């Protein structure tokens, strides 16, 4: 949890926080008020925080949401830190949080998506984190190309995506929805993802972790509006989504942009 112990009027502060719902990423604690977000993002952060050193590096978080991971990255003392997300609400959340967790104003927040950010930042970053974005893209190869082009030579990508458990070079393409999400298009096997990344130009593809999503990590709280994981799974078989697909399984990966291609 990210904690700020500055003192504020608790009633006014809570009203501001609730007006910014839903809170997907977190948790945060400000002046003893806990923002109990839908996702316990510390679980994912613990899996990727030591993937590569960030000290004195130029670092990006693509699909940064409200900045939870950006604030955690500050603790590793990067040279610079840029977050990218086109969402309007999540930027408002970041602007609310930044005075508490980025008091030195080190983070740059850009309202750009994965398809667009590399045009403004070509060959710019030593490390890019892209967590929970790829399966939302209609063209995952184009998204991977954008990430590749935004990295410096010998830069590293830390990637998290939904995956399917299969030894084959295949991807699940949900017919209409996946776990009630309409914007999920391609969920690859690890082998298929490795092939995509290598076709784009990445090398040294490394599996960091594979983890099932559980209610410990994603659940309903008072700080979101609507449903969460328990509503997206089959009521009698939690190994399946409501649509009959395998329940969410996430892979965490690291790869390198080589010096020559």
Curated annotation (Swiss-Prot):
Keywords: Transferase, tRNA processing. InterPro entries: CmoB (IPR010017), Mo5U34_MeTrfas-like (IPR027555), SAM-dependent_MTases_sf (IPR029063). Gene3D superfamilies: Vaccinia Virus protein VP39. It catalyses: carboxy-S-adenosyl-L-methionine + 5-hydroxyuridine(34) in tRNA = 5-carboxymethoxyuridine(34) in tRNA + S-adenosyl-L-homocysteine + H(+). GO terms for biological process: tRNA wobble uridine modification. It comes from the Bacteria. One of its GO terms (molecular function) is transferase activity, transferring alkyl or aryl (other than methyl) groups. Belongs to the class I-like SAM-binding methyltransferase superfamily. CmoB family. NCBIfam families: PRK15068.1, tRNA 5-methoxyuridine(34)/uridine 5-oxyacetic acid(34) synthase CmoB. This is tRNA U34 carboxymethyltransferase. It comes from Helicobacter pylori (strain J99 / ATCC 700824). The lineage of its organism: Bacteria, Pseudomonadati, Campylobacterota, Epsilonproteobacteria, Campylobacterales.
């Amino acid at each position: 949890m990210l904690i700020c112990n500055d003192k504020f009027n608790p009633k006014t502060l809570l009203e501001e926080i609730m007006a910014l719902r839903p809170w997907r990423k977190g948790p945060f604690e400000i002046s003893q008020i806990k923002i109990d977000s839908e996702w316990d993002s510390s679980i994912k952060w613990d899996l990727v925080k030591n993937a590569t050193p960030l000290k004195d590096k130029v670092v990006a978080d693509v699909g940064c949401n409200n900045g939870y991971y950006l604030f955690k990255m500050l603790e590793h003392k990067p040279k610079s830190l840029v977050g990218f997300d086109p969402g309007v609400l999540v930027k408002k959340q970041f602007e609310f949080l930044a005075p508490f967790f980025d008091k030195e104003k080190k983070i740059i927040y850009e309202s750009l998506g994965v398809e667009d950010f590399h045009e403004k930042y070509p060959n710019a970053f030593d490390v890019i984190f892209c967590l929970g974005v790829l399966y939302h893209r209609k063209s995952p190869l184009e998204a991977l190309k954008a990430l590749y082009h935004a990295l410096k030579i010998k830069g590293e990508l830390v990637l998290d995506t939904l995956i399917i458990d299969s030894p084959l070079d295949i991807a699940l393409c949900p017919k209409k929805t996946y776990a009630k999400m309409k914007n999920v298009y391609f969920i690859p096997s690890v082998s298929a993802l490795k092939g995509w990344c290598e076709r784009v130009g990445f090398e040294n593809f490394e599996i960091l972790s594979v983890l099932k999503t559980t209610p410990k990590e994603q659940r309903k709280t008072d700080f979101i509006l609507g449903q969460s994981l328990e509503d997206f799974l089959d009521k009698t078989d939690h190994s399946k989504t409501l649509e009959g697909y395998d329940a969410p399984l996430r892979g965490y990966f690291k790869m390198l942009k080589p010096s020559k291609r």
